[in-house]
Regions:
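A ligand-binding cleft/hinge motif common to bilobed small-molecule-binding domains
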Residues: 131-133, 260-280
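Periplasmic-binding protein-like
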Residues: 167-170, 232-237, 243, 277-302
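Extracytoplasmic ligand-binding site segments that recognize negatively charged/polar headgroups
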Residues: 67-83, 94-110, 117-258
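Signal peptide-proximal N-terminal region
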Residues: 58-59, 86-94
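Short, low-complexity disordered leader/linker segments with a strong preference
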Residues: 1-63, 389-390
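Conserved C-terminal helix/tail region of periplasmic/extracytoplasmic solute-binding proteins
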Residues: 40, 47-48, 252, 356-390
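Short amphipathic alpha-helical coupling segments at ligand-binding clamshell hinges
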Residues: 81, 91, 185, 227-234, ...
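Mature extracytoplasmic/periplasmic domains
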Residues: 292, 296, 301-362
Length: 390
């Protein structure tokens, strides 16, 4: 811009300012009322975390059903476990043959490979030795629950085909109204006073509980899991003298006096003691010369008609809620140590369990030992003992 242009611009500005100064002042106006101060915005509530099982729950509910097998409602508090699961997720339960043994469960899968109806089990709860054999035969499928890392490595398949659920030790459940002198150890059961009173909880050719009872007696008499002949000889003698009752013992047969001395897992016997509430009076004895602990395992059938419901069932069982429901039934849930470490076991539940020193002598047979024991007993029970348990 030239100096002349700058000069003219300045003159014009001065002229405008002079005229403005001569104009009358505008009437004063009131300041507008201040708008009310808005309350500071509250931070939005954090969104509830998404349920990591939401998709599985939806898929399971779409299937609508779950078929179980060999889950007596008076075993390990399974009645409450089943009802809680069904009510929580709205899934109908089809409960097959509650009194079946582990071998029967495996046969049910084999017999219903092509059956998507109500006779085909979705899930099984079997003795430890049955898990690996079922995997080898292609009868079960892998699935790792959310709490997988808190299940001890020694009782689970690394690929997730089967995993331990709970354990207990073998005990005598004795109806004191029918038995005057309560037996305290394995040798006592051969005494003449117990004629027609002693029973197993299943057929030793198919029942894991009965097989381990023979293993316990074998150890008490100098045998081994690999060679439990001493256990078979013991039952052969018991059968010979008439003390053995070839009836599958149940709570009802104990109460009626048909099998007043029965060999059960401690958690079943303790549960019966509470349930009978003195009518009849039940005494639970853990024989000191052969304390055998047994672990059961869960698995999903490779042919499950309701695979998502089966997976949700597993998630429920291995959640804190499911594990504590089992504890109410006197079993030691497989995640017990994790629950205890986090302080989530209610005091009243902990106090109901037998003293820990009772379990100090407990022997946990390895998978290989259980497999050897099962094979020996299944092959030799009939020819050595000769009793048809049913």
């Amino acid at each position: 811009m030239s100096k002349l242009h700058i000069y003219v611009s300045v003159v014009l500005l001065l002229l405008v300012a002079s005229l403005a100064g001569c104009a009358p002042a505008p009437a004063p106006t009131q300041a507008p009322a201040a708008a009310p101060t808005a309350a500071p915005a509250q931070p939005a509530a954090p969104a509830a975390p998404a349920d990591p099982l939401a998709d599985l729950i939806k898929a399971a509910q779409a299937e609508g059903e779950l078929t179980t097998i060999a889950l007596p409602r008076d075993w390990a508090n399974y009645g409450e476990v089943l009802d809680t699961f069904s009510k929580k997720y709205g899934i109908k339960l089809n409960e097959l043959d509650p009194n079946a043994g582990s071998g029967d469960e495996i046969q049910a899968i084999k017999a219903n490979k092509d059956n998507k109806g109500p006779q085909a089990p979705d899930v099984i709860d079997v003795g430890l030795s049955f898990g690996p054999s079922a995997k080898a035969e292609g009868l079960i499928q892998p699935y790792k629950v959310s709490t997988w890392d808190t299940i001890p490595d020694t009782v689970k398949d690394p690929e997730g085909y089967w995993y331990g659920d709970y354990y207990g030790v073998l005990a005598f459940e004795v109806n004191k109204d029918a038995v005057k002198n309560v037996p305290q150890d394995w040798p006592d059961l051969l005494k003449p006073e117990y004629k027609g009173q002693v029973a197993l909880s299943g057929d030793p050719r198919t029942s894991n509980q009965a097989i381990l009872a023979i293993g316990a007696v074998a150890l008490a008499n100098g045998g081994t899991f690999a060679n439990p002949q001493a256990g078979l000889d013991y039952f052969a003698e018991m059968n010979k003298v008439g003390n053995f009752v070839p009836v599958i013992a149940k709570p009802g047969t104990v109460a009626s006096g048909e099998t007043p001395i029965s060999m059960f897992w401690d958690y079943l016997a303790l549960g019966d003691r509470d349930k009978f509430a003195g009518n009849p009076t039940i005494e639970v004895v853990i024989p000191p010369s052969g304390v055998i602990a047994g672990v059961y395992v869960q698995a999903i059938s490779a042919y499950a008609p309701h695979p998502n419901a089966a997976k949700l069932w597993m998630e429920f069982l291995y959640s804190d809620e499911g594990q504590l429901l089992w504890l109410k039934g006197y079993v030691h849930p497989i995640r017990y140590n994790d629950l205890a470490a986090r302080g989530v076991i209610p005091a009243d539940l902990a106090e109901k369990m037998p003293p820990a020193d009772i379990y100090a002598k407990a022997i946990f047979p390895t998978l290989e030992e259980q497999t050897a024991l099962k094979e020996y007993v299944v092959a030799n029970w009939e020819k050595v003992v000769g009793a048809e348990v049913k």
